[in-house]
Amino acid sequence: MSLSIDVTSLPSISSSIFKNESSSTTSTLSGKSIGRNEQYVSPDIDAFNKYMLSKSPEDIGPSDSASNDPLTSFSIRSNAVKTNADAGVSMDSSTQSRPSSNVGCDQMDFSLNKGINVSASLDSCVSISTNQKKEKSKKDKSRKHYPRIEADSDSEDYVLDDSDSDDGKCKNCKYKKKYFALRMRMKQVAMQLIEDL
């Protein structure tokens, strides 16, 4: 998030609040070297207190303070303002109030009104392979293997129970003997489980 405050629009306030400190050494506020044509401004606490006390509470608005602590907000605002010592104009202000020469000015101009050209030529390739090896998951390994129930009764004298068949539709089914034997075995297993419970 970027907060820009135009100090030059308040000349009477900025002249009484800020005291200019020019230095060619490394600034503790920004951590970078300051050239001869640049200077940073720092807050004057007495001037700020005098300014805030001179205004009525109804006149104090968001432009005076961006936080609940006016002095903290004022300190943040003033430390963020970088000026040109030759012209005395804030570099963060509008383009019409900037000095005519760009010497000593740190500027970043964004020409967004001309449009943004984006080259969006995307090459996509999708390949689907269905020849994947089936891997056994851990869930399959952790499953309990119950004993298989096999019912083989191929003897000719085995009596089939047709009482619940579907009107004789399966009379010639070759799996009929195995089906009834398996069904009888399942009934016995179910009855045994019920008795055990």
Curated annotation (Swiss-Prot):
Subcellular location: Host cytoplasm
GO molecular function, one term: ATP hydrolysis activity
Keywords, in A-Z order: Glycoprotein, Host cytoplasm, Host-virus interaction, Magnesium, Metal-binding, Nucleotide-binding, Phosphoprotein, RNA-binding
Listed cofactors: Mg(2+)
Annotated Polar residues bias: 91-104
Main location: host cell
Superkingdom of source: Viruses
Binding residue positions for Mg(2+): 92
Disordered: annotated span: 16-36, 85-106, 129-167
Modification after translation: O-glycosylated.
Similarity section: Belongs to the rotavirus NSP5 family.
Quaternary state and interactors: Homodimer. Interacts with VP1. Interacts with VP2. Interacts with NSP2; this interaction leads to up-regulation of NSP5 hyperphosphorylation and formation of virus factories. Interacts with NSP6. Interacts with host DCP1A, DCP1B, DDX6, EDC4, EIF2S1/eIF2-alpha, AGO2 and CAPRIN1; these interactions are probably part of the sequestration of some host SGs and PBs proteins in viral factories.
The protein, known as: Non-structural protein 5
